[in-house]
Amino acid sequence: MVPKLFTSQICLLLLLGPLGVEGSLHAKPRQFSWAQWFSIQHIQMAPLRCTYAMRAINKYERRCKNQNTFLHTTFADVVNVCGNTNMTCPRNASLHNCHHSRVQVPLTYCNLTGPPTISNCVYSSTQANMFYVVACDNRDPRDSPQYPVVPVHLDTII
């Protein structure tokens, strides 16, 4: 059982590794803070089919986003990761506001499979349990004062 699970995880890393994580530091809709946009793009408590789940993101971006990762955890749990030790962001060495999760979380990786027509974006789904790295910043005035530091970018999954 262990070799099969290990092999599956290696295959998933090989699949996801070169693709990276298309992060939330791309243009965001003006009406949202970076933390709000992070939540819309990456927090989803229960797994949904990617084609359905991506509709909200694509509606705001007015395009079919190539790939996206949904963490099946709470915003509060990701905020807690912001309290972990600062590190250089793996995907952007000029940023030093990243934080590595201490526990793996269930996630869904969505990959655009069909032609990118905004009226019909079709995605494949890959489920996994993985660690993640997020960039965090001080909250925007539009964010809840409950959290002084908030996640703003999903840098990578490991």
UniProtKB/Swiss-Prot annotation:
Active-site residues annotated for this sequence: 42 (proton acceptor), 153 (proton donor)
Gene Ontology biological process: chemotaxis; defense response to virus; innate immune response in mucosa
PROSITE patterns (UniProt xref): RNASE_PANCREATIC
Cellular localisation: Lysosome; Cytoplasmic granule
Entries under Pfam families matching the protein: RnaseA
Keyword Glycoprotein: yes
Molecular function per GO: lyase activity; nucleic acid binding; ribonuclease A activity
Glycosylation sites noted in the Swiss-Prot or TrEMBL record: 34, 86, 92, 111
Keyword line: Endonuclease, Glycoprotein, Hydrolase, Lyase, Lysosome, Nitration, Nuclease, Signal
EC category: lyase
Signal sequence bounds: 1-27
InterPro entries membership: RNaseA, RNaseA-like_dom_sf, RNaseA_AS, RNaseA_domain
Major location (coarse): other
List of residues that carry 3'-nitrotyrosine: 60
GO cellular component, one term: extracellular space
Reaction catalyzed: an [RNA] containing cytidine + H2O = an [RNA]-3'-cytidine-3'-phosphate + a 5'-hydroxy-ribonucleotide-3'-[RNA]; an [RNA] containing uridine + H2O = an [RNA]-3'-uridine-3'-phosphate + a 5'-hydroxy-ribonucleotide-3'-[RNA]
Stretches that traverse the bilayer: none
Gene3D superfamilies tied to this protein: Ribonuclease A-like domain (3.10.130.10)
Its EC number(s): 4.6.1.18
Subunit comment: Interacts with and forms a tight 1:1 complex with RNH1. Dimerization of two such complexes may occur.
Family: Belongs to the pancreatic ribonuclease family.
Task of the protein: This is a non-secretory ribonuclease. It is a pyrimidine specific nuclease with a slight preference for U. Cytotoxin and helminthotoxin. Possesses a wide variety of biological activities.
Name of the featured protein: Non-secretory ribonuclease
Source organism of the structure: Saimiri sciureus
